[in-house]
Amino acid sequence: FFKQKTAYEIKECDWSSDVCSSDLTNEDFATVCDNLHKEGIQVVLDGVFNHVGRGFWAFRDVLEKKWDSPYKDWFHISFDGNSNYNDGLWYEGWEGNYDLVKLNLRNEDVIQHIFAAIKGWVEEFDIDGLRLDVAYCLDHDFLRRLRSFCDSLKPDFFLVGETLHGDYNQWMNDSMLHSVTNYECYKGLYSSFNSMNMFEINHSLLRQFGPDNWTLYKGRHLLCFVDNHDVTRIASILTNEKHLPLIYGLLFGMPGIPCVYYGSEWGAKARKEEGDPALRACFLEPEWNDLSDIISRLAEIKKNSEALNYGSFRSVLLTNRQCIFERKSEHERIYVAINADENSFHADFDAGCGTAQELITDTPHDFGGGTDLPGYSVAVWKMEH
């Protein structure tokens, strides 16, 4: 909801206090948040605390006053150099992008300015959390202070960070972030279908959540997705559109918090090389279809399942084109089955019971004599006790 000159010229206004739009007021946004809360929807804002645009008021003051600016230590600046814009000073930009001026997150005034903004958002809009842009760049001490501060505002305040590679535990732990983006499984999800190699995503899931003691993120809840605002939409990246319902079946069945990018619930298409406007298109109204129905049902199943939210992960059956895995909690056991092939597949495996309820279709299922998985199918079985 911030007013922007370009896709990257962010935070031109006083983002600590005002919704920056010519059409939307703070009162309007407070009403939006209130109505969302009444529908049981929590509001998580995008917090960009690593950098600001060149038009940010404090940086403009530095450009004007140089050494005499009280904000010169808000940024990583050298007055012995020069910038690409011939500013008469050098500054650090985010990953070499000098349209985005990196904030000094070890400066107490910067920290307090950010904290005051968050406090204002909680008090005025009652927000429920923050998604931290480029969290992998943020100072770890800052993240610890941010977690402590947000906990003091709201005990259940949610912090999720954008991370790409490496050990996610360095950001996701009891003193920093609650969750991070699971880019490892993002790649494994679409690649497993395009290469018809279910071993890839299964390997990642076992590495992250499997039954062995050494697995990386057991008990953690990573933000999982098949597309977002930075990557090609899943309907464009999959080589077989019949795999669309199946990949969402995997997304909602695997450990983690499933995230559906707006428009993708009906199969909107866009490629990264087409640029941000294509990836972040405006839709006049939803285009509800069969895919939307399946995703809606999967979301309902996930919401109401103890095992899918908190259960362990175990691989039951695995081939190049089929996989079955178990999610198990104290009171519930769920099997998720995927057949990515066009042909039916006969699966023989130990179900540990005789019957189950298939939750997508809400029909009983008998495991006697094995199970036939139709071509291009996903099943979610709630196993009998």
Model-derived segments and spans:
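Substrate-binding clefts and catalytic carboxylate motifs of secreted carbohydrate-active enzymes
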Residues: N202-K272, N289-D290
